[in-house]
From Swiss-Prot:
Gene3D superfamilies: 30s Ribosomal Protein S14, Chain N (4.10.830.10)
Name of the featured protein: Small ribosomal subunit protein uS14
Residues that bind Zn(2+): 24, 27, 40, 43
Residues making up the signal peptide according to the UniProt record: none
Gene name as annotated: rpsZ
PROSITE patterns attached to this UniProt entry: RIBOSOMAL_S14
Cofactor binding mode and count: Binds 1 zinc ion per subunit.
Subunit structure: Part of the 30S ribosomal subunit. Contacts proteins S3 and S10.
UniProt function note: Binds 16S rRNA, required for the assembly of 30S particles and may also be responsible for determining the conformation of the 16S rRNA at the A site.
Organism: Borreliella burgdorferi (strain ATCC 35210 / DSM 4680 / CIP 102532 / B31) (Borrelia burgdorferi)
Similarity comment: Belongs to the universal ribosomal protein uS14 family. Zinc-binding uS14 subfamily.
Length: 61
Protein backbone atom coordinates (compact mmCIF):
# COMPACT_ATOMS: atom_id res chain seq x y z
CA UNK A 1 0.00 0.00 0.00
CA UNK A 2 1.28 3.47 -0.79
CA UNK A 3 2.55 5.67 2.03
CA UNK A 4 0.10 8.50 1.30
CA UNK A 5 -2.91 6.19 1.57
CA UNK A 6 -1.61 4.75 4.86
CA UNK A 7 -1.31 8.26 6.30
CA UNK A 8 -4.85 9.14 5.23
CA UNK A 9 -6.17 5.86 6.64
CA UNK A 10 -4.41 6.44 9.98
CA UNK A 11 -5.80 9.97 10.33
CA UNK A 12 -9.41 8.85 9.86
CA UNK A 13 -11.41 8.07 13.00
CA UNK A 14 -11.48 4.27 13.42
CA UNK A 15 -14.66 2.26 13.84
CA UNK A 16 -13.17 0.65 16.96
CA UNK A 17 -10.81 2.43 19.38
CA UNK A 18 -8.28 -0.43 19.34
CA UNK A 19 -7.64 0.16 15.63
CA UNK A 20 -6.25 3.63 16.29
CA UNK A 21 -2.75 4.32 14.91
CA UNK A 22 -0.55 6.99 16.37
CA UNK A 23 0.89 9.07 13.53
CA UNK A 24 2.28 12.56 13.43
CA UNK A 25 -0.41 15.03 12.33
CA UNK A 26 2.17 17.09 10.45
CA UNK A 27 4.34 14.61 8.55
CA UNK A 28 2.62 11.22 9.06
CA UNK A 29 5.60 9.54 10.74
CA UNK A 30 4.53 6.46 12.76
CA UNK A 31 7.60 6.21 15.02
CA UNK A 32 8.80 8.48 17.80
CA UNK A 33 5.26 9.74 18.47
CA UNK A 34 4.60 12.07 21.42
CA UNK A 35 1.00 11.64 22.59
CA UNK A 36 0.76 14.94 24.45
CA UNK A 37 1.52 16.92 21.31
CA UNK A 38 0.21 14.54 18.57
CA UNK A 39 3.46 14.82 16.62
CA UNK A 40 6.70 12.95 16.12
CA UNK A 41 9.93 13.81 17.92
CA UNK A 42 11.43 15.45 14.83
CA UNK A 43 8.50 17.81 14.23
CA UNK A 44 8.30 18.48 17.98
CA UNK A 45 11.96 19.52 18.13
CA UNK A 46 11.58 21.73 15.06
CA UNK A 47 8.45 23.51 16.29
CA UNK A 48 9.73 23.81 19.89
CA UNK A 49 13.01 25.41 18.77
CA UNK A 50 11.05 27.90 16.65
CA UNK A 51 8.88 28.72 19.69
CA UNK A 52 5.62 27.59 18.08
CA UNK A 53 4.62 25.27 20.94
CA UNK A 54 3.49 27.33 23.96
CA UNK A 55 5.00 26.39 27.32
CA UNK A 56 7.90 24.40 25.84
CA UNK A 57 11.46 25.63 26.12
CA UNK A 58 14.89 24.07 25.78
CA UNK A 59 16.10 22.80 29.14
CA UNK A 60 19.43 23.75 30.63
CA UNK A 61 20.87 23.03 34.07
Amino acid sequence: MAKKSMIIRALRKPKYKTRQNNRCKLCGRPRGYLRDFCMCRICFRKYASEGLIPGVSKSSW
